[in-house]
Amino acid sequence: MPIKQTINPLERLVVGVATGTLTMSEIAKFMEGVMSARATRYRKLIDVTDCIAGFGEAEVAAFAQVLSNARKDRQYGPLAIVADPKRGELAHLFTTLAGEGLSAKTFRSIHDARAWLSEQSVSDN
């Protein structure tokens, strides 16, 4: 099932909620939406508590490389992932995709994730 996406320019916040089986193509569509809205520098909150991974480590590695290449000319804002601790592979996926040098953190509660994001700065550029 796709990631439901909400982009709020006033708050400079992107919220994604995934349910069902999450595939790499759905993650790619989510990222395309963020990029086309010019919201890469916004804070991002992704809730994956109600989904399961529909991909393997090889797909994650390949997709992370694509994102790394695309990131070279863009600024990225902080990323908060809300995940079920029993399904840590999804949290690991998003922190892997965030890559080095980007601020990403995993939370058990959406409230803690929002609190952390509110403390993070976002570029105006």
What are these regions (language model features)?
Residues 1-125:
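Amphipathic, Lys/Arg-enriched alpha-helical "gate/interface" segment within cytosolic domains
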